């Protein structure tokens, strides 16, 4: 098993490195094994690139009467998502890369990617997001410090909950922790976004209902 992982990992990385070019119908610019492998590894380390481009294009981000990237996914879900549409809100016409999402949404990833990549963004490319830049854009350095501190407190609290026997709290902690480690390359609210969706709570209610029914039968 260890041998398979040792041998298979470079091969998989090589295949994914080639796939980066093939999916865009672009000729592979590197022909050597090590060149393709190093090119793949380099393209995975784009976290700093998001920070650098975020600072560079910060003043060029679309300005609206109300704009908040930190809680963007949650706000867009309530205002222009499936839940917002139920209460009469106008849902976004597009769910993938588009000028609409790049200008009107509260998604930092869409807003910044359109500024940086322009036409390439409309073809489906993107540079992602970073919770640090979202906090900085919305609240400045003070916001980065305070909310990062709160994240640390939340992380400790969830670890404590994980050792208790409360099933629901334990499940919620696992759900948040699943995305928390990707936050440097993702949105601030992405980790707990599912907690605000109807789909998530619908599944939770179904599980609770079925569990109670099975308990009664036993």
What are these regions (language model features)?
Residues 3-7, 124-218:
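Hydrophobic alpha-helical segments
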Residues 1-2, 70, 108, 167-168:
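A diffuse structural propensity rather than consistent per-protein peaks
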Residues 18-151:
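Small-residue-enriched transmembrane helix-hairpin modules in multi-pass membrane proteins
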Residues 2-17:
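Hydrophobic alpha-helical membrane-interfacial segments at the cytosolic entry of transmembrane helices
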